[in-house]
Amino acid sequence: KEISKFPNVVKDVAFIVNKKVMSKEIEEVIMAAGGKRLRSVEVFDVYTGENVGINEKSIAYTLTFNDYEKTLSDEEVTNAFNKIIKEVTTKCNAVLRDK
């Protein structure tokens, strides 16, 4: 893979989903929604317990965005990030976790 001369933009996001939903399903939706500038999706935490429903889990991801031709603007990253949230909440019946 080509290495970009431009900086990565890294964002973390967590979703609460039914325990039966597999992380791989969510990752596929994230990658499809993230567009060509989303370079990677990595799970960094899976949580069950307090503040999460009995049949639910929280899965947290680190998303890395980059463009090989320019530095990404805040707006470009925010637009992609918002599309990811919309798609995951709709297609995976997920809730954005705010804490």
Residue ranges and their predicted role:
Residues K1-K99:
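A carboxyl-terminal module marker
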